[in-house]
């Protein structure tokens, strides 16, 4: 009787070990995915900052061209 109980206990312990091993593997996979996603977020933030700077530069250039165009139109009206 005690041998059967020991065998059942051994099976349960082995199942617990297998479950723990699988969960550890899953945790490692999730950590890798998390690291990848963190890097993607950082890259996207950097790209966004670059686009914001470029947008500001283009707005400034647009204002310069608008001012030049207004000046040119003003000269044409004078003539």
Swiss-Prot record:
InterPro entries: Cell_div_ZapB. Belongs to the ZapB family. It is found in: Cytoplasm. Non-essential, abundant cell division factor that is required for proper Z-ring formation. It is recruited early to the divisome by direct interaction with FtsZ, stimulating Z-ring assembly and thereby promoting cell division earlier in the cell cycle. Its recruitment to the Z-ring requires functional FtsA or ZipA. GO terms for biological process: division septum assembly; FtsZ-dependent cytokinesis. Homodimer. The ends of the coiled-coil dimer bind to each other, forming polymers. Interacts with FtsZ. This is Cell division protein ZapB. NCBIfam families: PRK15422.1. Residues 6-78 form a coiled coil. One of its GO terms (cellular component) is cytoplasm. Keywords: Cell cycle, Cell division, Coiled coil, Cytoplasm, Septation. It comes from the Bacteria. It holds the Pfam family ZapB. The gene is zapB.
């Amino acid at each position: 009787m005690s041998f059967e109980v020991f065998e059942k206990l051994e099976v349960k312990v082995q199942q617990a070990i297998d479950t723990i091993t699988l969960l550890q593997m899953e945790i490692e996979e999730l950590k890798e995915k998390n690291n990848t996603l963190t890097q993607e977020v950082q890259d996207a933030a950097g790209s966004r900052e670059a686009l914001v700077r470029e947008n500001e530069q283009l707005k400034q250039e647009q204002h310069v061209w608008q001012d030049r165009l207004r000046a040119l139109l003003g000269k044409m009206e004078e003539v």
